[in-house]
């Protein structure tokens, strides 16, 4: 139903599959139209811009029955400074044995800082999976956009060693608390 120009409640005929209801302004009947810009409600869609689903105090903003995350798998050994671009993947998996302790640097991408990408009060959670050989190494420093950050570690103790002949999975939750200000929660789990 909608309120027409004479303030009379009027009912609209049912729509056709694949159409969306579009307002025509106050007092005018809404119309069923094909979605603009090639967006189809019954086909796969890709968005490159930010989509906001705000929900309310009594409704969830988003409910997912299933979802996939992008995982970058690389035959690379963890060592030196590793740039983790959060716009590229949620999970980064290095399949060659780590060869030294490393720094992980979180950023949006090579051209966008994490500080620019995120708004205050937003968080992102990512995982870095590191293959370990008989000599194990560990993540000994964290930076965001090249600036040092001291994480808060699960259990309260910073990483001091890796786990030999395993896959160590590091999970980081990064919370933006202010301009270029972040809280990082870090944990590590051994898989063998």
What are these regions (language model features)?
Residues 2-58, 66, 85-88, 96-102, ...:
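Extracellular repetitive beta-rich solenoid segments
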């Amino acid at each position: 139903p909608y309120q027409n120009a004479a303030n009379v409640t009027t009912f609209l005929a049912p729509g056709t599959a694949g159409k969306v209801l579009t307002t025509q302004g106050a007092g005018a009947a809404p119309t069923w139209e094909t979605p603009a810009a090639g967006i189809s409600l019954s086909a796969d869609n890709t968005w490159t811009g930010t989509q906001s689903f705000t929900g309310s105090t009594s409704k969830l903003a988003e409910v997912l029955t299933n979802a996939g995350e992008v995982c970058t798998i690389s035959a690379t050994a963890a060592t030196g400074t590793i740039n983790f671009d959060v716009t590229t993947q949620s999970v980064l998996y290095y399949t060659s044995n780590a060869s030294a302790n490393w720094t992980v640097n979180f950023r949006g991408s090579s051209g966008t800082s994490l500080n620019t990408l995120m708004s205050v009060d937003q968080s992102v959670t990512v995982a870095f999976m590191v293959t370990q050989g008989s000599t194990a190494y560990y993540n000994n420093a964290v930076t965001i956009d090249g600036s040092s950050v001291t994480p808060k570690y699960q259990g309260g103790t910073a990483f001091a060693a890796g786990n030999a002949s395993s896959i160590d999975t590091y999970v980081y939750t990064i919370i933006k608390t202010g301009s270029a200000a972040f809280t990082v929660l870090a944990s590590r789990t051994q898989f063998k």
